[in-house]
């Protein structure tokens, strides 16, 4: 999983993906939110694709990720996640 990779390698792929999805897949907006150069964001998104196989150009994949992140946020807001 991306979280495991982040823990093991000190990367930030999970938050990068989450912010990219929350920015409606707008790379400039996501890069600004993450305080990254757009090239760095692109590198991370490519790395995420190679690690997970996720097609970030597929609308169904984006919808699935968006819903997953929103559900996670709701659970965190209610302190329901461990």
Model-derived regions: residue spans:
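Cytosolic nucleotide-utilizing catalytic cores of signal-transduction proteins
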Residues: 1-82
